[in-house]
């Protein structure tokens, strides 16, 4: 086990195999790792779950050009209250900022924080740190907001995301550390996602319709091997918003895992219709009846 101290709890780093049919559950071969962190993999092809959503800084130019993945009431309220300066968005792909932008903007935000302890500056700086994969700094900034505003939904959401992504990053680094020749294979390790789930539940306490907290929670369940919980949570996502392409895609992968090819085909087809073109390749490869 590799231990990592985060707050007053320890997180245990995990590499859990998830997907039957395509792989041998819990198999951990040195030549080909079958599944790591929610990825469906055979000997040649890796299919990853669509990633979690998190709050990211969005430039006004990007906003004007329509580079917004999904609209959300909390995001719109924040942007309108701040006259879109700054503006934020919910996205499950890392936005790419111009060269040197992040560093210079972080310096500006740091100055504001030192002068006033501005919660908005903490939120934007923490979100940029999260985008730049500086997870510990992101956690520190978002926690600072919650000390004063415990019901700040956007800070709660990104704090849960930062913890989850940090746990997964540490797992990926640990998994790549070469073993000494002759060393026995390491025991299966499991991440403690309890703080992450708790954070998403806090978001849902504030707004039970906050679909992105449900989506991210479903992804955590899938990574943790709780497949039925993950499917049911994706069901909740799609009951709230039937146009979340990523939920259809991820639920479709889980249906493949459970051997329900017809349901997988339907979900992946819908994901393709909604813009995830790679879903069609998954259908061709895994949804054909034998």
Question: Where are the predicted features?
Answer:
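Short coil/linker segments at helix-helix boundaries
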Residues: 5-52, 56-62, 66-93, 164-199
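Conserved structural position within tetratricopeptide repeats
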Residues: 111-114, 144-147, 201-205, 236-239, ...
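Residue-level recognition of tetratricopeptide repeat
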Residues: 118, 152, 210, 244, ...
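TPR alpha-solenoid repeat register
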Residues: 121, 155, 213, 247, ...
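Canonical tetratricopeptide repeat
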Residues: 124, 158, 216, 250, ...
